[in-house]
């Protein structure tokens, strides 16, 4: 796999993919909207406190690598950005809706179990059950051109193994396995509550973007 991102670049790409699906009327995103999305307290792990300068540096680096494009209208005072991370006409990375939803969720949240992924991707893709999530994860982990995700060793007492994307380089499996997440049942409930908060945040961000567009 050729694409390797920094943590901030991964956050930026994840946010652009997320907003493309969940708030298409507000996409592409302005720098302000992208910074707000990157710093969301819901549906983000870890929570970041990035400045617009931090985000712009990441965006500029991604534009140079043709992973993001500036879609600003002629003479517009506000730049608008969209991702070119996957499913572009000449790009190598082609993802299904389910694969794209999973990768987006991992770029925003890091390592997660199939159950957590199913709950957290409910606005990005449709999965009928956890087994369907597991099947897509296994496909992503065995891509012919190189794995896109890796399955982490299952921790003692846990029902599910976590999976992690490989877009930020190789994963230290032993270190990741040592990180102890919440128990299976509580983590799923927490994920559901986080998703509800995320949806409210989406509505608020959409309103902010509308106000911003009126003022620009």
Swiss-Prot record:
It holds the Pfam family DUF480. It comes from the Bacteria. Belongs to the UPF0502 family. HAMAP family: UPF0502. This is UPF0502 protein VPA1223.
């Amino acid at each position: 796999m050729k694409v390797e991102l920094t943590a901030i670049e991964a956050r930026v790409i994840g946010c652009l993919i997320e907003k493309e699906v969940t708030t298409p009327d507000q996409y592409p995103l302005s720098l302000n909207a992208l910074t707000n999305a990157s710093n969301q307290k819901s549906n983000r792990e870890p929570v970041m406190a990035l400045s617009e300068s931090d985000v712009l540096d990441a965006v500029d680096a991604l534009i140079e690598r043709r992973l993001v494009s500036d879609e600003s209208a002629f003479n517009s005072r506000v730049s608008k950005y969209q991702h070119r991370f996957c499913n572009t006409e000449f790009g190598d990375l082609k993802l299904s809706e389910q694969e794209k939803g999973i990768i987006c969720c991992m770029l925003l949240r890091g390592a997660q179990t199939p159950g957590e992924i199913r709950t957290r991707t409910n606005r990005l893709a449709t999965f009928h059950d956890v087994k369907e999530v597991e099947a897509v994860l296994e496909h992503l982990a065995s891509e012919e051109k190189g794995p896109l995700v890796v399955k982490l060793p299952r921790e003692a007492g846990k029902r599910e193994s976590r999976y992690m994307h490989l877009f930020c380089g190789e994963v230290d499996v032993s270190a990741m396995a040592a990180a102890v997440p919440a128990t299976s049942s509580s983590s799923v409930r927490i994920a559901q509550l986080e998703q509800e908060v995320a949806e409210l945040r989406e509505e608020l961000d959409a309103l902010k973007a509308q106000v911003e567009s009126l003022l620009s």
